[in-house]
Amino acid sequence: MPGITRRAVAIGSLTALATTLAPTKRARAQKQNSPGVSDTEIRIGQCIAYSGPASAYGQLGRAEAAYFQMINDSGGINGRKINFISLDDGYNPTKAVEQTRRLVEQDDVAVMFGMLGTPLNLAIRPYLNSRKVPQLFIAAGSEQFATPAKFPWTIGFQPTLRSEGVFFGKQILAGNSDPKVGVLYQYDDFGKEMLSGLHEGLGDKSSAIVAAESFIPTDPTIDSQIVKLKASGATAITLFTYSKQGAQAIRKIHELNWRPDIYLHSGAASISATLAPAGLEASTGVRIPGYIKDPSDPKWFDDAELKPFYEWIKKYMPTANLSEGFFLSGWAVGQMMVHVLRQCGDDLTRENIMHQVASFKDFRNPALLPGILINTSPTDYRIVKDVILQRFNGKNWE
């Protein structure tokens, strides 16, 4: 299927390299203007990987485009339609900077939204903060994106990697006062930040880490690392991986007839993408720090909060595979963006947008697990702070 031009409305295409949701004409009084805001539209910019090594994550951008299309079809936000311009960065920091400058300086967007990856968001953060352009609800878990004192225009969404590592450490100690911990981690900022959090969570018991084995994403297998971790005598293993290596690790652990307590990174916590390939029997007992529902899990099919999600995806993304968690994540952060804009009313200055971002009070996002509420402040930019220990029972999470 050919690419979609920047000025095409193409929500149904799953190969769009740039998507624009064009507004309809409507004259109305406006109290305050901001770059990217007119009487009829609010321009939202994004660059994300529609090509390159992380192109699978382009589904996030497509889901967000489809969510904004639904909002436009229902009348928009306070009378304005969303003009969503999403460009391809190929998961290349240099390209991300180029596309971001284009969106800010040529397309005159009000905000940048939902960009993917730690290195890319770090690359564009200085520019956006210097221009006082909101960098909102990014798809990166580094603690570096929750520092409002230094970068007040940048905020993430998911739990930070460090906090997840801390959670693992505390949960391991809660289950065993004298554990032996093995770690499999991706050798980059993602894995290292989680490992640092694990040390913090274990506190004065951090010497309980008896072995730590690393890998790089292009490694064809991690079997040798798992063999070494078993030889260490570890009774608990933390998998700071994404789905591919997580599935490989769980399967190899089972093949070795090794039965440690397994703690899996939330980013790999998909039944269909990780546990099923590893084997449901092999995956039984796997623990995760849960915070978002898995829409492919039958447990949620009749969930009242997710009913709008299932209706939306059936209408706007009928070919989407529910086993890919990108779609629910895109729907969830799209809701965050729309809530903020609605709270702004007619004061759609960038300053007020950030004021609303920092003013969530017990906000309930229906994609999150029951009991998780969102609270922010000018000094606390962590959106999802709470996670819940979940265990796989062979069929679903409990």
Show the residue positions of the predicted features.
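N-terminal secretory signal peptides and thylakoid transit peptides that target proteins
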Residues: M1-A16
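C-terminal segment of N-terminal export signals and the immediately downstream linker at the start
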Residues: L21-R43
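Beta-alpha junction/loop-to-helix N-cap segments that form part of ligand/metal-binding clefts
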Residues: Q30-Q32, R43, A56-R62, S74-P148, ...
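Extracytoplasmic "Venus flytrap"
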Residues: S34-S38, G45-A65, L87-P93, L116-G117, ...
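Loop/turn elements at helix/coil->beta-strand transitions in domains of secreted/extracellular proteins
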Residues: I42, R80-I82, D107-V111, R131-P134, ...
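Extracellular/periplasmic Venus flytrap/periplasmic-binding protein
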Residues: K95-E98, E143-A146, F151-N257, K299-F301
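Extracellular/periplasmic periplasmic-binding protein-like sensory domains
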Residues: I253-S329
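Segments of small-molecule ligand-sensing domains
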Residues: K315-L328, M336-W397
